[in-house]
From Swiss-Prot:
It comes from Photorhabdus laumondii subsp. laumondii (strain DSM 15139 / CIP 105565 / TT01). NCBIfam families: GSH_gloB. This is Hydroxyacylglutathione hydrolase. Pfam families: HAGH_C, Lactamase_B. InterPro entries: Clx_II_MBL, Glyoxalase_II_hydrolase, HAGH_C, Hydroxyacylglutathione_Hdrlase, Metallo-B-lactamas, RibonucZ/Hydroxyglut_hydro. Its EC number is 3.1.2.6. Keywords: Hydrolase, Metal-binding, Zinc. Binds 2 Zn(2+) ions per subunit. Monomer. It catalyses: an S-(2-hydroxyacyl)glutathione + H2O = a 2-hydroxy carboxylate + glutathione + H(+). Pathway: Secondary metabolite metabolism; methylglyoxal degradation; (R)-lactate from methylglyoxal: step 2/2.
Length: 250
């Protein structure tokens, strides 16, 4: 498999995944031209588009890509039907063609219908889990998002987290403010250097995220204390909610 990230808009990543038989999927195309240019440069013809949720910066490129490849299948949750999805999928479904076998995982929170696509080791999780952070709660509840992130945390440690935004520096700045330790500090400096060299910090691995992503550390006593919660006095979803609120105001 070959994985390509295409920078788009101000901080988006569009993903292309190509299997050994040159079957290609496009994930969350924010805009069309960068995708069309990349496909042309490699001589690839896409088979499908995968949409994680309905926000414009994840679906804006669908019409332009469909104009060029009108036979494309477009998979997405029900909330993306008006954005171009032709095959509606939800948690528990699977998508199989070529060497692809994607499992669909329901991950509501950022939006109510948000889904993720998983084919080991790749997880295309849209705006659910970022490196060092997680998505805002635009439609869902903190409890939903906490449960969704928990589903991701149960995947193998070598899972590649292919999220849709380059937010890592700002996420790590907040993480260091909340839970200043050597591991987080070192990773913060690492991603700063990467971005200074115009390198993407994505994909990351689930193993890395378990070490540096404070939204996966809601059971940490020091973290709870540092965000104003008496240790072990609240459900972990409430700790997550408080952490997300503080990130929104950071």
């Amino acid at each position: 498999m070959e994985l390509i990230s295409i920078p788009a808009l101000s901080d988006n990543y569009i993903w292309l995944l190509c299997d050994e038989n040159r079957h290609v999927v496009i994930v969350d195309p924010a805009e069309s031209q960068p995708v069309l240019d990349t496909l042309e440069s490699r001589g690839w013809i896409p088979d499908a588009i995968l949409l994680t949720h309905h926000h414009h910066d994840h679906v804006g490129g669908v019409p332009g890509i469909i104009d060029r490849f009108p036979e494309l299948l477009v998979y997405g949750p029900a909330e993306t039907q008006s954005k171009g999805a032709t095959i509606i999928v939800c948690g528990g479904d699977s998508i199989n063609f070529g060497h692809f076998s994607f499992q669909i995982i329901d991950v509501p929170g950022h939006t109510l219908g948000h889904i993720a696509f998983y084919q080991a080791p790749y997880l295309f999780c849209g705006d659910t889990l970022f490196s060092g952070g997680c998505g805002r709660l635009f439609e869902g509840t903190a409890e939903q998002m906490y449960t969704s992130i928990g589903k991701i945390a149960e995947l193998p440690d070598d899972t590649l987290i292919c999220c849709a935004h380059e937010y890592t520096i700002s996420n790590m700045k907040f993480a260091h403010a909340v839970l200043p330790n050597q591991t987080i500090s070192e990773y913060q400096q690492k991603v700063i250097r990467m971005r200074e060299n115009n390198q993407p910090t994505i994909p990351t691995t689930l193993q890395t995220e378990k070490k540096i992503n404070i939204f996966l550390k809601c059971d940490d006593i020091d973290l709870q204390r540092n965000i104003g919660i008496t240790p072990n006095s609240q459900p972990l979803s409430a700790v997550f909610h408080q952490l997300r609120r503080q990130k929104d105001q950071f």
